Amino acid sequence: MSTNDNWYIEHFQPTGSAIGYRISGKLDEVQSPFQKIEIYQTTDWGKLMIIDGAVMLTSRDNFFYHEMISHPALFTHAAPKRVVIIGGGDCGTLREVLKHPGVESATQCDIDEQVTRMSEKYFPELCDSNDDARAELLFDDGVAYMANCPAGSVDIVIVDSTDPVGPAEGLFNKSFYESCFKALKDDGILVQQSESPLALLDLIKEMRTEMGKAGFQSFKTLPFPQPCYPTGWWSVTMASKQANADFAFRQADAQAKGFDTLYYTAHLHTGVLVAPPFVAKALGE
């Protein structure tokens, strides 16, 4: 990354590309025990959160990610009541999960409390549900939390992590996925952010392989736009314990969802289940 001439620029070595934001000032910086968190004011994209030099979110476009890591899985499950979010310290995913009235409890476990505190201060719109009676915010190791989670106690596990380096490295391997598999009920769903399908298809394939080794039998990778991330295109991957799951969703419920979204719709959900040919070929779909 670099900051010069009033621009914040993140370089993405795998594709020889970069993304930049014109900034008007630096608002805050915290070095937590785990990572460096910075907040900038941009001229056109609202506030910008950076973690260890990588863009995490902006005020203007975070809704793509938060809605797509939440609503497809929640509308795919028949009746999700107990949700666990690993990571997600900015609290945007928690907010989306708790838009579903049938959810009875949502536990968010992020290792770094400072991410949440910075989000509460600079992105309060993402933290609307932090005081919801159904919400539980924990600041602990997500790997350990899932390892100790009672068997068959969770409907959906959402892994809303940073890239598979540093504090998040342990969230992308067979051992962690085995813990998720154990904690999920038979009809449970695991959903994880799975990087850019344009630049990192090999990583997505590796993730799905590790999930399969842990016992998951069916997978679906959903691509979507995310302007602030490398290549501008991102994905989440859902995994099911069921063989040959088609990931059909409750379309009528999604159409009559009763809450506002900025990107997710039932029609969009239908379309995103059909992978682009190059993704389908690479992933064997």
From Swiss-Prot:
Binding-site positions, spermidine: H66, D90, D160, S161, T162, D163
Location of the PABS domain: 5-241
Name of the gene encoding the protein in the UniProt record: speE
Catalytic activity as recorded in UniProt: S-adenosyl 3-(methylsulfanyl)propylamine + putrescine = S-methyl-5'-thioadenosine + spermidine + H(+)
Localization, UniProt: Cytoplasm
CC per GO annotation: cytosol
Pathway info: Amine and polyamine biosynthesis; spermidine biosynthesis; spermidine from putrescine: step 1/1
Gene Ontology MF annotations: spermidine synthase activity
The family this protein is said to belong to: Belongs to the spermidine/spermine synthase family.
EC number: 2.5.1.16
Principal place of residence: cytoplasm
CDD domains listed in its UniProt record: AdoMet_MTases
Active-site residues per Swiss-Prot or TrEMBL entry: D160
Cytoplasm recorded as keyword: yes
Assembly behavior: Homodimer or homotetramer.
One GO-annotated biological process of the protein: spermidine biosynthetic process
Classification via InterPro entries: PABS, PABS_CS, SAM-dependent_MTases_sf, Spermi_synthase, Spermidine_synt_N, Spermidine_synt_N_sf
SUPFAM superfamilies: S-adenosyl-L-methionine-dependent methyltransferases
Protein name in UniProt: Polyamine aminopropyltransferase
Family matches, as HAMAP family: Spermidine_synth (MF_00198)
